[in-house]
């Protein structure tokens, strides 16, 4: 597998995770982010593992991830976990802002670091390696919107 190439099983697995969440069943720390598609305008949902930094939820997107392009274009979305949903403003962080967030990602989302290792984004998965991905991976903050 080339460095940064997504595995073929990811899309089917994501569909299963979205379906499970729609039934109101939580699966570990996974949430579903739904944003309008940047071309179609139709809702697009993707599973992700948000984590807290500075008291706010954040998410990390693999290089070239469609959900990141859609989130960037929309600027707003719905973050759901089981039967609970909240509207969020989606703010992309600069590479400099992303560095300390990625260091926390290393500790908070070890499964994400393992995924980065398996796809060749990092070699050992150390905090320094993950932090060095700033500017290569997209990091977003999810600010709650009033109901």
Stretches with model-predicted labels:
Residues 53-55, 84, 147:
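Short strand-connecting beta-turns/loops that link adjacent beta-strands
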Residues 1-30, 107-134:
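Alpha-helical membrane-targeting segments
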Residues 28-63:
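Short beta-strand segments
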Residues 63-143:
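Short, structured beta-strand-loop surface elements
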Residues 35-40, 81-83, 144-146:
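Short acidic, glycine-rich loop/turn motifs
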Residues 2-17, 42-47, 94-100:
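Short low-complexity stretches enriched in small and charged residues
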Residues 21-23, 57-69:
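Covalent nucleotidyltransferase core used to form phosphodiester bonds in nucleic acids
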């Amino acid at each position: 597998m080339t460095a940064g190439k997504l595995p073929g099983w990811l899309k089917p697995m994501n569909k299963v995770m979205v379906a499970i969440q729609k039934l109101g069943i939580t699966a570990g720390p996974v949430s579903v982010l739904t944003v309008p598609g940047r071309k179609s305008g139709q809702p697009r949902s993707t599973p992700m593992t948000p984590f807290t930094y500075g008291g706010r939820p954040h998410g990390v997107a693999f290089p070239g991830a469609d959900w990141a392009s859609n989130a960037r274009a929309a600027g707003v979305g719905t973050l759901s976990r089981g039967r609970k949903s909240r509207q969020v403003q989606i703010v992309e962080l600069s590479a400099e802002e992303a560095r300390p967030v990625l260091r926390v990602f290393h500790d908070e989302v070890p499964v994400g670091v393992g995924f980065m290792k398996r796809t060749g984004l990092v070699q050992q998965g150390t905090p320094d390696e993950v932090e060095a991905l700033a500017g290569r991976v997209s990091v977003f903050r999810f600010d709650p919107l009033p109901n």
